[in-house]
Each structure stands twice: as C-alpha cells, then as structure tokens.
Amino acid sequence: MSLAIVYTRAALGIEAPLITVEVHLSNGLPGLTMVGLPETTVKEARDRVRSALINSGYAFPAKKITINLAPADLPKEGGRYDLPIALALLVASEQLNTTRLNQYEFVGELALTGGLRGVPGAIPSAMEAIKAGRRIVVSSDNAAEVGLIGGSDCLVADHLQEVCAFLAGQTSLSPPLAEAPARDERYEDLLDVIGQQQGKRALEIVAAGGHNLLLIGPPGTGKTMLASRLPGLLPPLSNQEALESAAIQSLVNLHTAKTRWRQRPFRAPHHSASLAAMVGGGSIPVPGEISLAHNGVLFLDELPEFERRVLDALREPIESGKIHISRSRAKIDYPARFQLIAAMNPSPTGHYQGKHNRASPEQTLRYLGRLSGPFLDRFDLSLEIPLPPPGILSQGSQGEESSATVRQRVLAARERQMLRQNKLNAHLENREMKNCCRLRREDAVWLEQTLTQLGLSIRAWQRLLKVARTIADLAEVEEIERYHLQEALSYRAIDRMLNHLQKMMA
C-alpha cells in the first residue's frame, strides 16, 4: 500500500478543524515534498519525523514522498502534525499493518528519540474529535488537559512505539485520569481590608450581578486591594466554564491549564500593554488578555495610563462577550465574557480636592479626558474610595465580614437570578429587562428626572436598572424599590466628579 490517510486537528483559535494527512510513496528520486500551506515549523517535521522513525527502530522510506495536509486553504503551524505524519509514513511503507486508522485522530509533536510531546490547544482538538465520533491519541503531557473532558475517548501515550503497538493490536493505551473537581480556596480575604465599607458593599453587588466596577481614589486607599478580593467572592467555575477557560489557556500556557483550571481567571495587565496584547493578535491570532480573562476578572490599574485606543477596543467585547480578530491569514472569534474592574486616581497628582490637591480643575478634566465617554458608560458602578478617617487604623477590623460570609449572600443572589432569567443581571437584554426590572410608575418618573439632571445616557439608565435589580436580589426582594434605585445612583461617582469640576470652572 503506497497511500495512507491519517486524521488530525489544526489549532485555529478555540476551534479545531479536521486535517487529513495524506502520504503517497512513489518511485523516483528519494525526497520529501510537503504541500497544503504548511508553516516553517511544519516543514521542519521532515527532520524530526526521520530521526524519530529511525530511533524507534523503523526505516525511513527511500522513495519519493508526497505529504498533503488537507484542506490546503487552512494555515498550519507547530509540531502537532509530527505524529500523524509518522504514522502515515509507516502505514504507506507497510511497516505498520492496521485497519483502525479511520477510528482515531492523532495529535502530538515528536522528539528525535520518538517520544511524544504536548501541543497547545489539545482540549478543542479532543472535543471536536469526540463530536465527530472518533477517539483521539495525545501525548501524556496533555493528559491533565484532556482529562477535564472525561470518558474513555481520549487516550495518552509517551512514545511512537506505544502508538504503533496499539494500532497493531499488541497493547492498549489508557485514558487520562479525570481531575477531581476540587475547589481552590486560596483567595485573599476581605478581612484584610480596613474600613472602606462602601467599597466592600460595591464588591458584593458586583460579584452578585456580574457588573463592571470603576474605583476612583487617591493613592494608597485600597483600590487595588479591594479589586484583588473579588475572585474570593465569586462562585467556582462550572464544568462548562472550566473547559472554556482551560481551552483558551491551553493555547498559550500549558502549565496554567494543568494546574489552575478550576480557578476563575484574574488578569491584571500592565498599563503599557499594547492593543494586540490586550485583545489578541498575530498573523494567526492568539488570544489576548480579555480572552484569557474569560469567565473571570480583568483588572486595569492606573486606568488613564492605558492608551486610549486600547481602552476603546474593549467597548465591543464588554457588550458582546466575544472578540472578532481579522488578519490576512485568519479570522478568529475568541470568547471574552469578563468582569471589568478598573482603578484610577482622580487627578494627575492623585487628589482633586482638599489640602493635598495640586492640580487645577482644567488639569484634572484634561486627565480624565483620556477616557472616552462611551468607555466610561460601560461601567455599571463607579465608586470613590476616600482616604481613611482618623482613628480607623487603631480600631482594627472589628465587626468585619469575611469573604466566605459575603460569598454566601452572593451565591444566594445568583441562584435567584438563574431561577428567574437563567443569566446574571449584567447580561440581561433590553427585552428581558421589561419583565425583570419593572418599576412603579412614580419610581420610573423619579428615575428619569434624576438621570436628566445628571445628564446620563440611556445606556447608563439600563445599567442603573440592572444594578438596582441586583441590590433587590441581595435583599431577597421581588420588586425594585425606590431605595434600591437610590443606592444604585450612589455608585455614580464619576458623574458627580465631572459635574463638580465643571461647576468649579463655570
């Protein structure tokens, strides 16, 4: 048999399209030709596969070899095609006799010794193979990842010889051990934060409803400390969420996907991060920070120091929960459903009023002008974190609640939302808000008048209603009351600050 066909999977974002490896041996001058839009890393497979076959006790065919990676229009990169190419060569040269090739897919890089190495994107490949009705063989380096899927459709091996013996019916391959769904509770606790009761209340609301939060305050008041406590208030990842997050992480960091797959992601990029680093990029786009924060938290400290175009690029993903990256060689969609938490100083000197203020209203407004209005509109809550009052440090943390206590209320509020609308309040669409966020007529009139006075947009009105709905859920109340709306309005610090500065300049 001079022709062999082996199935494998490409890595194209979180998708894994089927790739057919076709190998044909013919008479002629010995040589190897590889077609099907392979990258340089794929072309290097000829040397790796040759050495792996020889060191595994097989002969490299001394014939004219043509290898086709179909379909030809899909770009291919990386060493993930080594194992299927080696198997196809062995079958085509009749060194391996098997009739079971069409029942399996193979993904793995080969060492020169014939050992198997892990590849990025093993989870999407395994899920797509199972969906197609085939089993998949991967390296034991990827065992922890594909073990998240469970079942016996994923098999692991350490060496090319093991795979060949399995296909010949001489031995069996074992499935990966399924990971125990244990929670990782190593989160920082709210008890560490002294004072800042309104900030803690805002964190509870944000955790319960999935809202975005902007923290404004002078340096050293605990903005970053508060933000880092949010993951400890959130529920653990569900099985589906864990798979989604692990699939994204496996594209860029194998170690993280193995060891931290149950933790909600908490990404805190530096303010010098580029547009490509934040939203994703490359000739074949890789996920950026917003996708790595999927199902978790994206924390942006020193918000005005980020490039404006980087921040404005976040506007669409915040609304849609995904990012579409178009490049000349590939167009890829990545999920990006994250909670945005940001922190900033109110002025370039850190203060905008009081004895510490050294900036004029014009300088402060120019500083805040780095943030576009549409971007600020994406925050459901904005809160001022003031300097602690005198005496608070000597009192310690008396009567403070732990993250575990607050988390119980958060879980109860989330359960109410799931029973009512099967999604968090922050993700409610306009038509759903009519049923879930109903107001009494007098409250609706009062809210509209208040928004007109503050000069807020319709988007801000929608976000206010969602926050009020979450406050009502935390209070275990069915209808939104006036005091829920008043508390939601109290979390509009950025609007009050801008109005105050404009009055000072008038």
Predicted features along the sequence, with ranges:
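Walker B catalytic acidic pair
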Residues: 295, 301-303, 313
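Basic, amphipathic alpha-helical bundle interface domains used for macromolecular binding and assembly
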Residues: 41-46, 61, 68-78, 284-285, ...
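Peripheral, non-AAA+ core regions of ATP-driven protein-machinery
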Residues: 1-214, 218-224, 261, 326, ...
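P-loop NTPase nucleotide-binding/switch module
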Residues: 168-205, 209, 237-290
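The Walker A (P-loop) glycine that initiates the GxxxxGKT/S ATP-binding motif of P-loop NTPases
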Residues: 217, 280, 302
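Walker A/P-loop
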Residues: 214-255, 320
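Short loop/turn elements that form and flank the Walker-type P-loop nucleotide-binding site
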Residues: 60-63, 100-101, 131, 150-151, ...
